[in-house]
């Protein structure tokens, strides 16, 4: 519940900043990167296995968000906006490590770490395929 509240707080912060800059939110659209990540793990299996798979995907999405926010925070000339992204980066890093910790807690660590590496390899292929298309997570 705490994570959900924190994420909603982030959404509000981003939305407020968008409005402050004179923009509006666009329509929600499907994220090809996320859809392709979800194709990696097979359907079925135990509830625990499916949960571990979802935790790994969520962890990867958070890790990539963290990387993007770090780059933005380091390159932006607007110090206020740079700090905004740095704060989000720290939070995303905590989420990423939390999801991996939970996956390792509920699944066999050796198997989870193997699946994590395989997911990273799969993601590299997704990134080659998607190229530099506009997206949130990809």
Question: For the regions a protein language model found, what residue spans apply to each?
Answer:
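Non-heme di-metal
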Residues: 1-138
């Amino acid at each position: 519940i705490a994570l959900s509240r924190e994420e909603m707080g982030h959404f509000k912060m981003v939305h407020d900043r968008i409005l402050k800059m004179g923009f509006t939110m666009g329509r929600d659209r499907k994220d090809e990167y996320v859809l392709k990540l979800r194709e990696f793990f097979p359907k079925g299996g135990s509830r625990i296995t499916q949960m571990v798979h979802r935790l790994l995907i969520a962890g990867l999405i958070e890790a990539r968000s963290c990387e993007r926010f770090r780059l933005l925070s380091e390159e932006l000339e607007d110090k206020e906006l740079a700090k905004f992204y740095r704060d989000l980066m720290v939070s995303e890093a905590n989420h990423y490590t939390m999801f991996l910790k939970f996956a390792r807690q509920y699944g066999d660590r050796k198997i989870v770490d193997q699946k994590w590496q395989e997911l990273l390899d799969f993601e590299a292929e997704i990134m080659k395929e998607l190229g530099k298309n506009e997206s949130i997570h990809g």
